[in-house]
C-alpha cells in the first residue's frame, strides 16, 4: 500500500475502503438471542400476467382474486399441498393462490381445526421460530397460523423463475410471502464457487462475493440469504415485473435473480467498479454525474416509498458502476445486509422455500440508529440521536417519507465525498488522502466498538464523526455551516448532553483549522458556473439542511430528480 489511506474498517486500501466490519449480532434486552435483523411489507394491485404499478395501500401486495369459488382446499399438513391441484381449472395466474382459503380467516375454513390447531403444524412453526431464534410475543405467535394459507399451492413455484412476492389475506390482516424457487441447474453450476476457480471480488462479515463469467456469486449466512431473497421478491413484484422475469437490475437496484436457500448462495451480475474506486472524475462531465445521482436517488425513493424498505447502508462501496474513463454509463445501489422493512410491517412477512417445502420467517425491524449505516456516511441526524441515546430507535411515525429522507441523507454524504474528489485540482488520490483519511480514521474508531458493551466510547467516537462531517460540509457550504453547527450544538445542550456538546465543539474547531478549502476553490467555482453543477450543489445543500428528526418530514421529491 503506497498512500496509507485507512478505511473505516481499519484496512489498508488501494485506496478502497469496504463497508465497516459488521458488528456480531448482539443481545438486546428483552429480545431473542442474536436478534438484530428484520423485514416486512406494503402493496401492489391484483395479479395479472404481471404485477401492475404499486399503490399506497397497507400491504406489500394486494390479494389475488380468484374466480374459482366453490372449492375448499384441504392441506397436506407437512407443507399444505392443495389436494385439488390437478383438477383445478383456474386461469394460469389466478390458480397460483388457492381460491377462497386465501381470502377467508383460517378459523372459518371447514378444516381449520385440523390444519391450524394440529400439534404437528404448531410444532413445525415453533421449530422454525426456534431455529432462527426470533423473538415473538404471544400475540405475534398466535397470528402466525395465518401463514399456513400461503402454502396451499406449490404450483406457484412453476410460474416463477426468481423470488417473487405474493399477498395472503386473513380476516384481520394481510401477510406478505416471497416464494423462492430452487433451480437445481444453477445450484450445480454456481453453489461451490471455490471449486470452480471463481475470482474473489470481496470478503465481508456477512460472506464472500465471487465472479464467475460476469455472474456475481454471494455466499452468506442464513439470515442474509433470507433478506436477499425477500427484498429481491418485493422489488421484483412492486416494479411490475413479469412473473418469469429473471432481471437482476430493477429501477437501478441490484437484486438477486436466483437464491439457493440450501447453500445460502445468491446470484446477480458484476460491474466494472464500485463508486469508491472510481477515480476519473472530471468537473466538465457534471451533467453525466448529476444524472447518475438522480437515478440513484430515485432508487432510494422506490425502495422506501413503494417497497417500504430502508437500505440503511448507502455508501460509495455499495454503489456499482460501469464506465469508460470519466463517463459513467450506469450505476446501481446494492447490498441489503443492513436493510430493514419499515417497522409497521413487523410480523407479517416470510419466505416460502421450494427446496425444503418450508417457511422461513423474516426477522422484525428494530430501527436502532447504532445498527444503521457505515459511520463514515451516517446521516447527521442519526449520529446526533446516538449522542442522546446510543441504542435509541428511529421513529418513522409510520410515514414512508421520513424513512426515505433518512436514506437520502446518507446518500447526501456519498455525493459530498464525490464532489470533493471531483473539484480537487490535485486529483482524486490527493483528495482521498486529504479529505477522507481523517474521516475514515474516526469512523474506524466507531466501527471497532460495540455500542452495548462500550456505550460511552461509542458515543464519543460518533460525536467526532459528526463534527468531521460538519467540517467537510463547510468546505462546500460555508455560509450554511455556522447555522448547522449551532443547531447541532444547541440540540446537545438542550438535551443535557454537555460532555458530547463540548467534544463536538472541540473536534469541530480543531479539525476546521486543519482543513483547507483552497484545493477545491477553482473546481467548485467551475461547478457553480454550470447549470447541472448548480443543481447538484442546490440539491445537496437541501439534503444537508435535514439535520433534525423534525426535518425528516420535508418534501424532497424535487431533489436529485431530472
Curated annotation (Swiss-Prot):
UniProt-listed PROSITE patterns: PROTEIN_KINASE_TYR (PS00109)
Membership in a protein family: Belongs to the protein kinase superfamily. Tyr protein kinase family. HCMV ganciclovir subfamily.
Active site location: 313 (proton acceptor)
Protein name, as recorded: Probable ganciclovir kinase
Lineage of producing organism: Viruses, Duplodnaviria, Heunggongvirae, Peploviricota, Herviviricetes
Single GO term (MF): protein kinase activity
Region (Disordered): 1-32
Function: Phosphorylates the antiviral nucleoside analog ganciclovir.
GO BP terms, alphabetized: viral process
Keywords in alphabetical order: ATP-binding, Early protein, Kinase, Nucleotide-binding, Transferase
Compositional bias of kind Polar residues: 1-16
SUPFAM superfamilies listed in its UniProt record: Protein kinase-like (PK-like)
Organism annotation: Human herpesvirus 6A (strain Uganda-1102)
Stored InterPro entries: Herpes_UL97, Kinase-like_dom_sf, Tyr_kinase_AS
